[in-house]
Amino acid sequence: MFQRFKLGVVSLCISLLLSTTSFADSWPIAEAGASAAGFSEEGIAKLDAAMNKIVADQDVAGMVWILAKDGHVATYETAGLARIDDQAPMTKESLFRIYSMTKPVTGVALMMLHEQGLWDFDDPISKFVPEFKDLKVMTSYNDAGEMVLEPVKNPPTMRQLLNHSAGFGYGLGGSDPVNEAFRNTQVLASDDLDTLIERVAEIPLMFEPGEAWYYSVAVDIQGYIVQRLSGMTFGEFLEQNIFTPLDMTDTRFFVQPQDQQRFTEVHNWDEERQRLVQRPHRTDRPSYLDPDRLESGGGGLVSSTHDYARFLQMLVNEGELDSARILSPESVRIMRTNSLRDELNLRGSPTSAGQPGQGFGVDFAVISDPSKANSPQGAGTYYWSGAAGTWFWIDPTEDMFLIGMIQAQGPTRPGAPNMRNVARDIIYASLPQ
């Protein structure tokens, strides 16, 4: 069952050729300009000014942003600082904790294995994770946190794992006993994916699979399945099959010693001092400088704006970039198509997903009805974000994407605007009417 994933000779040759390409030689190299990309010059100038103002107002310490349409870069700019404490400037080479923007990368990896016929959407997860064969579901609990458990009636499927309706918790929020168990057993601080799976297997599901949507540990489980099916470590699979072919030379699960000065720090607003301050490093998770840290498919990657823009353009191109094909067009379309029943609410989401007119595909939220979502974006726009504020969206009706890279968690300046909405609204007003 768990056969090793085989690289084709052509893919391997492409990978070897692309691995010699430098950062400066690969798209996006420079701006084509607003007009060449299909926007008004005034609109893109307004976008750049708005993002610079957000930095100047100390809503974030620094930012890098790229807007591209039809493969042409309308703007690729930087502003502010990567680290306040040593006044290091933000640059196009800056590295970021992308947290949950790791998830779409994991989804692409799993879809590559789907194309190999190694799993199907209706397969039970336990076919690939035997530890999940006897899962229990929490039906109720009392004030003391004591749960009433029952055997799962319908074992969760791969489809439900991919759209967060399988019933797993996460531990990022929630005061219920399931999420408390995730925190108490330090699931997300596991040393490796095998340990993570062992811990998750001991925690009941929050609900019967398919009955609700809950943002969950599902994508870490997906990473484990990639590892199990491919016979490689998860990191090795990503490196060989996604990062090297796409020339994503800055993307991995840790920061190399030679890249430490490029690594941005996380900041938040300090109300007492009335300014942004640099946050201390977390002590409950392994350091990003540790090459042996958990290869978390749900939130572990470090990347640059340049690298992630290449990943996004591959998706805009329906699976291909610079002659390197990663996925088939059909697989990309599956990923960006809502697979939830209309009545399921996207609760527990860190983004605006869960509003009317939105659903979920394979590790992306999807805007299925822009009018209900109160968005100017086209139907089928898909997006996600990271816990430190990084965000992106892709509008397939315009062959367009935006990526914004920041590092911010915790309190924000009172009155700070929603920079994502500010950017989005300016961009769509800049298109030909």
Indicate residue ranges for each PLM-predicted region:
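Sec/Tat signal peptide C-region and signal peptidase I cleavage site
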Residues: 20-24
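Short, well-ordered beta-strand elements
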Residues: 392-393, 399-408
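Short, conserved catalytic-motif segment at the N-terminal edge
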Residues: 25-29, 35-98, 118-120, 134-141, ...
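A short acidic/glycine-rich loop-to-helix N-cap element
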Residues: 408-419
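N-terminal secretory signal peptides that target proteins for export/translocation
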Residues: 1-4
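Active-site SXXK
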Residues: 45-52, 65, 71-73, 96-125, ...
